[in-house]
From Swiss-Prot:
Superkingdom in the source lineage: Bacteria
Function, as annotated: Acts as a chaperone.
Listed GO MF terms: ATP binding
Name assigned to this protein: Chaperone protein DnaK
Keyword Protease among UniProt keywords: no
Species assigned in the record: Acinetobacter calcoaceticus
Induction: By heat shock and primary alcohols.
Keyword Repressor among UniProt keywords: no
Alphabetical keyword list: ATP-binding, Chaperone, Nucleotide-binding, Stress response
Gene designation per UniProt: dnaK
Similarity remark: Belongs to the heat shock protein 70 family.
Amino acid sequence: AKIIGIDGLTTNSWVAVLESDKVHV
Protein backbone atom coordinates (compact mmCIF):
# COMPACT_ATOMS: atom_id res chain seq x y z
CA ALA A 1 0.00 0.00 0.00
CA LYS A 2 1.20 3.50 -0.74
CA ILE A 3 1.15 5.98 2.13
CA ILE A 4 0.76 9.64 1.13
CA GLY A 5 1.90 12.26 3.63
CA ILE A 6 -0.68 15.01 3.26
CA ASP A 7 -1.79 17.38 6.02
CA GLY A 8 -5.35 16.61 4.96
CA LEU A 9 -4.98 12.99 6.09
CA THR A 10 -6.03 12.25 9.64
CA THR A 11 -5.08 9.48 12.08
CA ASN A 12 -8.20 7.58 11.02
CA SER A 13 -6.97 7.66 7.42
CA TRP A 14 -3.66 6.11 8.48
CA VAL A 15 -5.51 3.34 10.35
CA ALA A 16 -7.72 2.69 7.33
CA VAL A 17 -4.63 2.44 5.11
CA LEU A 18 -2.95 0.04 7.52
CA GLU A 19 -6.05 -2.15 7.69
CA SER A 20 -6.38 -2.11 3.90
CA ASP A 21 -2.72 -3.05 3.62
CA LYS A 22 -3.26 -6.06 5.87
CA VAL A 23 -6.28 -7.13 3.83
CA HIS A 24 -4.32 -6.88 0.56
CA VAL A 25 -1.33 -8.66 2.04
